[in-house]
């Protein structure tokens, strides 16, 4: 599942509908995806999807937001909705491309802790792309330092910080 810095939420759909979209596309046929008759045609599937969305929303503490539209949410709330849309599919891996870059500094620190806790709880693989050394060092259990498309060093953050493989890695890590 993928999470981007731009959130990629549908502005005309509610939080619940945004989170349900990948499930609808994966689990329903054409008739089941139709706006008015879909819920009637595939009642059991729709009920199961609503339950999955509710469970993930509870995990991310966004249950009170399920009936709101993205324009009514803060940046951190939008980020959690985008993450929830990825989580609801129960993927084995997450690809996150600069997911916190649009947030203010205080919210970034808070979301770092939330994502780290989520990673521990889900036990899924997270590939996390960031240009922020603090994010990389605090959130990862294994990291790769890349420059100009080349991998310069791979290892636990503490090893990379204490024993940089090159001057470029040392400059980047600080």
PLM regions and their residue ranges:
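ABC ATPase nucleotide-binding domains
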Residues: 9, 14-168, 171-174
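Serine-hydrolase catalytic-loop signature spanning alpha/beta hydrolases and amidase-signature enzymes
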Residues: 6
């Amino acid at each position: 599942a993928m999470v981007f810095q731009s959130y990629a939420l549908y502005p005309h759909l509610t939080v619940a509908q945004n989170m349900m979209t990948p499930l609808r596309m994966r689990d329903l046929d054409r008739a089941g995806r139709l706006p008015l008759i879909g819920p009637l045609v595939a009642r059991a599937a729709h009920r199961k999807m609503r339950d999955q969305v509710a469970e993930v929303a509870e995990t991310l503490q966004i249950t009170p937001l399920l009936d709101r539209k993205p324009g009514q949410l803060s940046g951190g709330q939008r980020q959690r909705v985008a993450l929830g849309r990825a989580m609801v599919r129960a993927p084995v891996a997450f690809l996150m491309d600069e997911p916190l870059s649009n947030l203010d500094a205080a919210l970034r620190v808070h979301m770092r802790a939330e994502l780290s806790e989520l990673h521990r709880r889900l036990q899924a693989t997270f590939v996390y792309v960031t240009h922020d050394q603090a994010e990389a060092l605090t959130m990862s259990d294994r990291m790769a330092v890349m420059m100009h498309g080349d991998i310069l060093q791979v290892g636990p953050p503490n090893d990379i910080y204490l024993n940089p493989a090159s001057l470029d890695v040392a400059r980047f890590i600080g």
